[in-house]
Curated annotation (Swiss-Prot):
InterPro entries: Autotransporte_beta (IPR005546), Autotransporte_beta_dom_sf (IPR036709), Autotransporter_adhesion (IPR051551), OM_autotransptr_brl_dom (IPR006315), Pertactin_virulence_factor (IPR003991). SUPFAM superfamilies: Autotransporter. The gene is ycgI. It comes from the Bacteria. GO terms for cellular component: outer membrane. This is Putative uncharacterized protein YcgI. The lineage of its organism: Bacteria, Pseudomonadati, Pseudomonadota, Gammaproteobacteria, Enterobacterales.
Length: 147
């Protein structure tokens, strides 16, 4: 997979409340052949994605006792996908056109927490909906331990 991703953030009032404007663009090209264990296979000439995104994130930084910090945040963005002709052949049975082009809204909410100078974590949920595409609710969780 080849990916070029550019994201610019503009931070306003970074002390307690923070509003970040977000501009992103991406060009992605994925692999061409997939074979599943149930015998299904797909072949594509090229799977591409070119989009631009404009959004804003609002966060609130809370300093808790014992050196802990928590930062809940909300993000809303609009993404415009330009590629509309990703052709895929599934099981050698004709062509399928994977058209993900158009605008979609992206909505996310999460919380980041620093438990110590070396241990932190995050929890988040997201949803996306737009022309021809709906990404159902998803959740992410992670921890970071640095030493």
């Amino acid at each position: 997979m080849n990916t070029i991703h550019l994201r610019c953030l503009f931070r306003m009032n970074p002390l307690v409340w923070c509003l970040r404007a977000d501009v992103a663009a991406e060009l992605r090209s994925l692999r061409r052949y997939y074979h599943l264990s149930n015998g299904m296979e797909s072949k594509s000439v090229d799977t591409r994605s070119i989009y631009r995104e404009l959004g804003a994130t609002l966060s609130y930084n809370m300093r808790l006792g014992n050196g802990m910090e928590x930062e809940p945040w909300l993000k809303a963005a609009v993404r415009k996908e330009f590629v509309d002709d990703n052709r895929v052949k599934v099981n050698n049975d004709g062509n399928f056109v994977n058209d993900l082009s158009g605008r979609r809204g992206i909505y996310q909410a999460a919380i980041k927490a620093s438990f110590s100078s070396t241990f932190s974590g995050h929890l988040g949920v997201g949803y996306s909906h737009g022309a021809g595409v709906e990404s159902p609710w998803n959740a992410v969780a992670g921890v970071n331990w640095s030493f």
